[in-house]
């Protein structure tokens, strides 16, 4: 992922080893800094052997910096992106999520199909309501991945969340030799 983002921006981007954990869904807003914090969310649905939703959540500073690098212009308001900005954000999220999806696919020996990404800028609580509405009766845990990017002498924390359907979470953890209670 860092290699692809570096190539896109023509600049070295370092990605530290991510922190990955399974957490209760209701803990996610707090881990993101609060339900009211504004994030840019890129959402991808996965299907086939593993079903659920991946979300790549970027803070406003990281979004503005990436767009500036990708588009070569100053971004005034990341909350109201134009079509070119949306496309660039979607591609960034697609690269990040698909790097984790490909790793899961290989590690679990599963085929995983990915939807076209969609993008929205809103408060974290609102962004998280999308998958919760869909999966409310299916499960209440998610894979929470914290990523730290370093470029331009700055450090940015972004998150990838995987909200699997309950059966997919059980199958994934069973395949990894972990128990699910």
Give residue spans per PLM region.
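Composition-driven recognition of glycine/serine/threonine/acidic- and proline-rich low-complexity segments
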Residues: 1-181
